[in-house]
Design a protein with these regions (language model features):
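Catalytic phosphate/metal-binding cores of nucleic-acid and nucleotide-processing enzymes, i.e., regions
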Residues: 1-129
């Protein structure tokens, strides 16, 4: 895996998807993991078009559509450093894991895909640092 700038969320996200590409042989479901590009700065016209097309504020960054342990997929909100969740993101948190950095996200994904039968309710709802 190459070195990534880990001073912001985009670097952590690139590192996570690089890790996922490397681990796909062990966890084939990783090939279906994707980023939801809701964030970022956009002009008003583009933002209005995207909103009409279904873009919603607060939707988690990463989706892994693999059913496990009674869940229909894993949503991850990826944070870096001291960044915190927004008000809109908090509305989604009942259905989302918040991971501070790519390594905790990778750890959660492995736990979810390989050992979901061992997940406890606390692990399912915990914010990982």
């Amino acid at each position: 895996m190459r070195n990534f700038r880990l001073d912001d969320e985009s670097g952590h996200q690139e590192a996570l998807f690089s890790w996922a590409a490397y681990r796909t042989e062990i966890m084939p479901e990783l090939q279906y993991m994707y980023h939801v590009p809701n964030g970022g700065k956009r002009d008003k016209a583009t933002a209005a078009v995207l909103k009409r097309q279904g873009v919603k504020a607060g939707v988690p960054d990463i989706m892994l559509p693999a059913a496990r342990a009674g869940y229909h997929g894993l949503y991850i909100e990826l944070k870096a450093g001291e960044n915190t969740t927004t008000k809109k993101q908090k509305e989604w948190l009942e259905y989302t894991a918040v991971c501070y950095g790519w390594q905790p996200a990778a750890q959660l994904i492995e736990q979810y895909l390989l050992h979901s039968d061992e997940l406890t309710k606390e692990q399912e709802t915990v914010t990982m640092r």
